[in-house]
Amino acid sequence: MDGRTRMQIDFAHQPPSRVGIEWELACVDRGSGELAGVAPEILRSFPHDDAHPHVTGEFLTNTVEVVSAPHSRVGHAVDDLARLIERVVDVADPLGIDLMCAGTHPFSAWPDQDVTPDNERYATLLDRTRWWGRQMMIWGVHVHVGIDDASKALPILNALLVHLPRFQALSASSPFWSGQETGYASNRALMFQQLPTAGLPPDLTTWADYERLVGDMTHVGVIDHHSELRWDIRPAPKWGTLETRVFDGVSTLGEIASLAALVQCLVHDMSAALDRGEELPRMQPWFVRENKWRAARYGMDAIIIQDAAGDEALVGDDTRALVERLSPTADALGCEAELRGILDIVDRGASYQRQLRVAEENDGALAPVVTHLVEELRSGLGR
């Protein structure tokens, strides 16, 4: 890959396969179900520092994000999230605020939402992206998994792109936008990729390719820092991880645990394969693009491209086989129960399917969908 500038980017030391999770949560008014811009008020109860785990704000004032510490076990990271959310709920309850999570809100309108003030990063993003950036009324889950050497980052990233449609379909939770059913399982996926540095990563092979890309993009003014590359899967050099960001926001701790376990097992297996001198699978970029669109459009009904040869399968059938293959790895990592929760999603339906059922049962009314999402989150906390 040619480039005019190569920027050296140090990759932090992180014990391999350690996992950390970020969960974006929407604040909604208990009476109306509308989004409520109360995150700044809630966050005053959580003094900011750089310690983990922590609670923080996001792009919009209707959003609170909880972040786990890195752990070797998925279950311990999820325990962090549960403790943090319990604290957030204790602050939000007296304000008449509930928490929910989905890729999008079923009916609130984006022009009614406020951008978090006094944040230079958000102001710069908004100044550059304008109308599209202003519409980013979306929520997601980010899963970090540690890798022990920067040279593994791009091969593992490319291999994870083979699995991206599974991640997208299993987490899909955004069938509605501004009160309308979109016909997409994940409308968030299509919204987020409108930002110029979001969506699928470019076709890179080595860490040097990545450094040259960052150098070139900095040189021509696309970004000021590599953290502004908001790809669906990206290296996170500061933490020594690969960060899978394609997931729609999901409403239960159990689903988050299952998705995190799936990524952890895959990265662990891929890293071990590289240690054995094996080449990891990858697919043509247009196959990856097509898979993302199919999963965003059809969710668990998507027929996905499985490999570079163009073999296809229904995503649910393909995922069942993958879970069985990863079972020994999950057992070794202590996340077998969490991984098998993926099969529960396949059997009972992803969040978008459950939301659509609730809307249908209520003659198309969407307020009950918000109630359903709030109740799913609370039930996972035992409330």
From Swiss-Prot:
Q: Which UniProt keywords apply?
A: ATP-binding, Ligase, Nucleotide-binding
Q: Which Pfam families match?
A: GCS2
Q: Which InterPro entries match?
A: GCL_type2/YbdK_subfam, GCS2, Gln_synth/guanido_kin_cat_dom, YbdK
Please explain the role this protein plays, according to its UniProt record.
ATP-dependent carboxylate-amine ligase which exhibits weak glutamate--cysteine ligase activity.
BP term (GO), one: modified amino acid biosynthetic process
Q: Name one GO molecular function term.
A: glutamate-cysteine ligase activity
Identification of the protein by name: Putative glutamate--cysteine ligase 2
Please indicate which superkingdom the organism of origin belongs to. Answer: Bacteria
Look at the named UniProt entry and state the broad enzyme category this protein falls under. ligase
Species per Swiss-Prot/TrEMBL record: Clavibacter michiganensis subsp. michiganensis (strain NCPPB 382)
Q: Which reaction does it catalyse?
A: L-cysteine + L-glutamate + ATP = gamma-L-glutamyl-L-cysteine + ADP + phosphate + H(+)
Indicate the family of this protein: Belongs to the glutamate--cysteine ligase type 2 family. YbdK subfamily.
E.C. numbers: 6.3.2.2
